[in-house]
């Protein structure tokens, strides 16, 4: 009789554990559709600050949860004549050097042009490889902080704003819990005084939610204004406004004016 009672208690405990785990899983994957946005650089001088920002997103903004999907927007560094936004053609493991992460091709189902010529994602045995360093810089942190999230890459021309309008209508109605990251570095090749002035104008423009295309190009000093314009347009549709978290540069990090070797970084999140 005593053994039977102990067995019953054990089963009750196991049942409660299963119910709690099911509840956690349900809460994790059945939240209402939500869009979140962040601007994170891929210039990795003082990479600890990038980790610090990811940690802020994970533990303060998401409060320990994580998005279901991540759209990672990055400039097309090596094919500057490309005028269209592209994504990956098939879901596959993508390698950068010796590091690998799976990317999803689900955005190509929305008739977003995919990289058929292998300019960005080159066939490599049964997988793909890339020379775009933003892949690994963000992958290793997404693996660490948002390991469950499915990643959708968007590779954008840097200055062809006309590429944005058609993709906006395809993305805006997605019923996902999404974090949209624009992987962008800001002012380059200027002394720190000029860099700071340009960054202040960029920050003001992003905070003001400016969507005038000509003004955006004139006022944003970054390696991919189109990446920022796409993110800004989506954020505006979702009534999210930019907040500055950090701003630094090669000069402030190294505590000396780097002049032509200067690159600035701006970390922003939207609420």
Regions found by a protein language model. Name each.
Residues 264-266:
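Short beta-strand micro-motifs in enzyme catalytic cores
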Residues 2-17:
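N-terminal Sec-pathway targeting helices
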């Amino acid at each position: 009789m005593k053994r039977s009672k102990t067995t019953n208690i054990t089963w009750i405990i196991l049942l409660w554990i299963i119910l709690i785990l099911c509840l956690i899983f349900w809460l994790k994957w059945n939240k209402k559709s939500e869009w979140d946005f962040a601007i994170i650089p891929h210039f990795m001088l003082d990479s600890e600050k990038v980790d610090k920002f990811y940690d802020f997103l994970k533990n303060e903004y998401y409060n320990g949860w994580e998005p279901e999907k991540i759209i990672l927007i990055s400039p097309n560094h090596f094919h500057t004549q490309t005028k269209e936004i592209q994504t990956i053609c098939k879901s596959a493991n993508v390698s950068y050097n010796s590091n690998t992460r799976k990317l999803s091709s689900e955005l190509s189902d929305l008739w977003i042009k995919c990289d058929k010529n292998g300019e960005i994602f080159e066939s490599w045995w049964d997988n793909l490889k890339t020379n775009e360093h933003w892949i690994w810089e963000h992958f290793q942190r997404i693996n660490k902080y948002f390991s469950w999230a499915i990643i959708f890459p968007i590779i954008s021309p840097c200055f062809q704003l006309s590429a944005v309008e058609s993709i906006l209508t395809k993305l805006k109605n997605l019923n996902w819990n999404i974090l949209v990251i624009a992987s962008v570095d800001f002012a380059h090749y200027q002394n720190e005084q000029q860099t700071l002035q340009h960054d202040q104008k960029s920050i003001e423009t992003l905070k003001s939610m400016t969507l005038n295309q000509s003004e955006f190009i004139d006022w944003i000093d970054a390696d991919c204004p189109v990446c920022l314009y796409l993110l800004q347009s989506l954020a505006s549709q979702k009534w999210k406004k930019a907040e500055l978290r950090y701003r630094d540069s090669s000069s402030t990090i190294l505590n000396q004016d780097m002049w032509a070797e200067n690159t600035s970084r701006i970390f922003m999140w939207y609420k």
